[in-house]
Amino acid sequence: MSIDLKKRKVEEDVRSRGKNSKIFSPFRIIGNVSNGVPFATGTLGSTFYIVTCVGKTFQIYDANTLHLLFVSEKETPSSIVALSAHFHYVYAAYENKVGIYKRGIEEHLLELETDANVEHLCIFGDYLCASTDDNSIFIYKKSDPQDKYPSEFYTKLTVTEIQGGEIVSLQHLATYLNKLTVVTKSNVLLFNVRTGKLVFTSNEFPDQITTAEPAPVLDIIALGTVTGEVIMFNMRKGKRIRTIKIPQSRISSLSFRTDGSSHLSVGTSSGDLIFYDLDRRSRIHVLKNIHRESYGGVTQATFLNGQPIIVTSGGDNSLKEYVFDPSLSQGSGDVVVQPPRYLRSRGGHSQPPSYIAFADSQSHFMLSASKDRSLWSFSLRKDAQSQEMSQRLHKKQDGGRVGGSTIKSKFPEIVALAIENARIGEWENIITAHKDEKFARTWDMRNKRVGRWTFDTTDDGFVKSVAMSQCGNFGFIGSSNGSITIYNMQSGILRKKYKLHKRAVTGISLDGMNRKMVSCGLDGIVGFYDFNKSTLLGKLKLDAPITAMVYHRSSDLFALALDDLSIVVIDAVTQRVVRQLWGHSNRITAFDFSPEGRWIVSASLDSTIRTWDLPTGGCIDGIIVDNVATNVKFSPNGDLLATTHVTGNGICIWTNRAQFKTVSTRTIDESEFARMALPSTSVRGNDSMLSGALESNGGEDLNDIDFNTYTSLEQIDKELLTLSIGPRSKMNTLLHLDVIRKRSKPKEAPKKSEKLPFFLQLSGEKVGDEASVREGIAHETPEEIHRRDQEAQKKLDAEEQMNKFKVTGRLGFESHFTKQLREGSQSKDYSSLLATLINFSPAAVDLEIRSLNSFEPFDEIVWFIDALTQGLKSNKNFELYETFMSLLFKAHGDVIHANNKNQDIASALQNWEDVHKKEDRLDDLVKFCMGVAAFVTTA
């Protein structure tokens, strides 16, 4: 699809936002394709695009591939009720407004001067026509011929009850200049929009009209009725010219084929699509049940202009394309029209999902089961990769098919699901439990099809829970009567049986090594088993029935949801309760561990989604939603959270902010919960998962939070000796730095290889030397080159040393450490120097001490001793200052000893000695205590 516009960043409206969750940010919703609002088709050159409605947003697909091109940038205040497309622009009607969009970005908003809601749209020429539910028609016109879309109000038309009642459709017939055809439930009206006059009114039709479509023939419009009649009406003559009858069907959509074949498609509310050949006056093909009757059947069916392709949609959240192959000619001259062939489709659940699970470790696919009895594999990366899992049964062992009707109903609703990918592609890797069925089914994720085996319960109970071993070899079936059955996934053979529970088994799990199995049931019992020996290790009785279980393999923790509205966390190794989480005020619907096992996210009928921190046992985040969550699942890498809700056919995806920035783990109460809207299909500008996670959450700032944590004092009391809070290894490294360096030196230089392969015998230097000889350039050996480089370096070093001194003899350059040392001597405050010295690495400390000027008048050495004396007086970092003095004597001890009669050095050392002796009292006290203790113990 070629569009001559470039993407541009849209500045988000500055509006007051409510408080957001500090952990989760709404990202997007997957699985929504269309609803009952008829789609719109548009053309750009030779390409077509399709606009579908999904509640308060719309999506634009490329008709050639059904790839998603654009999504509206933001949700409308209320649901969209009508769509229309005209070249680059999409018109969406909601309430009393019409939004004009380009590439999903709102360009203009028209607000009708009425309280009635817009119901139908029609765009032709310079006009935009919008009808409302009070039978008014508002006409807008381009204010200038160069305008891209109509935006100026022109006139208003009114249809009275006498003229036909409720408006059904707005159409424009080809060659009817400035004329608008208004189809009501009983009449067809023709208005001149330029003058605002009613030009023509048809006779009243006996049956109620439900839809209308202009024919490619002049003056003809097709009308569909509630009784199943298709009326070809001539507007110029004002009479019927043909009637097609479809028994017991309400017609919902009409479309004419325009690629040379005179075919008419008729969509019905029962979900059938019927094709008529207008030349032969006969029905040629019927597509049965392409859309579900319970959701309105076919809401829209449209032939692409000049193409043998028809696009259909329905309220069952699906968009389909069918194509007519070239017709076959027979010898008698008859033409055989081949039935339309399924071409491509996009879809999703038609009812809210009942169970979800991530299908792989890369968070690429997600399995979703719904109340519509389907199992879908949704792609989080590319919508075109989503597809429904096939329920076609395998052949019997003798090669025959399973008996019965080929048009069968789907499997019952899935109530539990388990998946493991260790053996994907080798045999089935999915188990599902279905409502009111006494056996579980297997599925193959690679083939996207139901598997070969069905696993029966052994006590004639319904399947209530399923699980799989991490190796993918064993499947576990929990019964409503309390038994646990284990099957081999490859052969489908029964392997083990357990009977511990007296009521339904609600959860089964096995550790990663296939050693310990855990089960729970409505009887409140948690059972622990040795899987290899098939023995019971023990059981734990809880105070309330257990409704669900989630196991975290890496930590050997499992969480249980109880009927008393609590979540209990149990250690599988010790078989004890380690945490009990209280807070929900209604039944817990779903919960899940974070991948690292630190958090539990739970949802409840109290409309909250809570995040629990297991180390502290507190609730650290809460979200209040208007739509109760029924499932929550963390992605394997922890960057996403998937939720499903009571209403809505899609899967909501939330971004985990903790993956991208630090979040507070402070325990909060319900008054601090954030009320948030669910994710939607709309995208603001170029938003991505990362931008949503990093945006300001409008809540607490980490810098302004009192975390109630204790911070150790730097010094409890000035009279007490305080050691440094740094690692003990730092002092040891300082004391033995010379030994460490000696050990780190290589014992011998690396040796050259004596014999090299023929293709490595000439190094780059050797090749260059030989080239120099051939060119007549003087030869230099590597030793000569090295000697020349050393001499050049010596000259540079000498020049650098000379540049350090000015003519006055004062230093022209000094390091930051030396500068702090000099400034401290002037102010008699070395605190800044001491802070810098303590934060230095051992190597940096050694370098600075060795770099002290050891020539007369020994100012830097004296200043450094004074600084250490001041540090020792503060009683802070006691052992570090002692170590620094030891390093000073190691580096400059000979200079200090040789100049011990220097007045400045002697005075500085005397001050150090006085302070040091004063602090030596600690050593005397310790020795005294040791002596007394030794006397008492030996006396």
UniProtKB/Swiss-Prot annotation:
Sequence ranges of the WD repeats: 40-71, 81-111, 119-158, 168-201, 208-245, 252-287, 295-347, 354-388, 415-454, 463-497, 505-541, 546-581, 583-624, 626-664
Keyword Hydrolase listed: no
Keywords, in A-Z order: Acetylation, Nucleus, Phosphoprotein, Repeat, Ribonucleoprotein, Ribosome biogenesis, rRNA processing, WD repeat
One BP annotation, GO: maturation of SSU-rRNA
Record-given protein name: U3 small nucleolar RNA-associated protein 21
Organism superkingdom: Eukaryota
Oligomeric form and interacting partners: Interacts with snoRNA U3. Interacts with MPP10. Interacts (via WD repeats) with UTP18. Component of the ribosomal small subunit (SSU) processome composed of at least 40 protein subunits and snoRNA U3.
Domain-level remarks: The WD repeats are grouped into two tandem seven-bladed beta-propeller regions.
A GO CC term assigned to this protein in UniProt: small-subunit processome
Residues with PTM N-acetylserine: S2
More details: Present with 2020 molecules/cell in log phase SD medium.
Signal sequence range: none
The protein's role, per its UniProt record: Involved in nucleolar processing of pre-18S ribosomal RNA and ribosome assembly.
Chain ranges passing through the membrane: none
Modified positions (Phosphoserine) in chain numbering: S772
Cross-referenced InterPro entries: Quinoprotein_ADH-like_sf, SSU_processome_Utp21, WD40/YVTN_repeat-like_dom_sf, WD40_repeat_CS, WD40_repeat_dom_sf, WD40_rpt
Organism: Saccharomyces cerevisiae (strain ATCC 204508 / S288c) (Baker's yeast)
Location of the protein in the cell: Nucleus, Nucleolus
